[in-house]
């Protein structure tokens, strides 16, 4: 169980995504296009960030699903 807890996201430890784009293939190929500051969500394995300050980061992982929206996680 190799969990890298060095850059733990401050928002929440659960991965989430508001802007998710999927192809119409079977299985679908989904990519989260959310831009986050300084880090990607906790389950992201390929995080690409700009060199600006603060860095704007996008997760480029391809999944066959979308994560739950981040906005709804504040209501429970």
Swiss-Prot record:
Keywords: Disulfide bond, Protease inhibitor, Serine protease inhibitor. The record marks 51-52 as: Reactive bond for chymotrypsin. SUPFAM superfamilies: Bowman-Birk inhibitor, BBI (SSF57247). Pfam families: Bowman-Birk_leg. Disulfide bonds join 16-70, 17-32, 20-66, 22-30, 40-47, 44-59, 49-57. It comes from the Eukaryota. GO terms for molecular function: serine-type endopeptidase inhibitor activity. GO terms for cellular component: extracellular region. InterPro entries: Bowman-Birk_prot_inh, Prot_inh_BBI. Gene3D superfamilies: Cysteine Protease (Bromelain) Inhibitor, subunit H. The record marks 24-25 as: Reactive bond for trypsin. Belongs to the Bowman-Birk serine protease inhibitor family. This is Bowman-Birk type proteinase inhibitor DE-3. It comes from Macrotyloma axillare (Perennial horse gram).
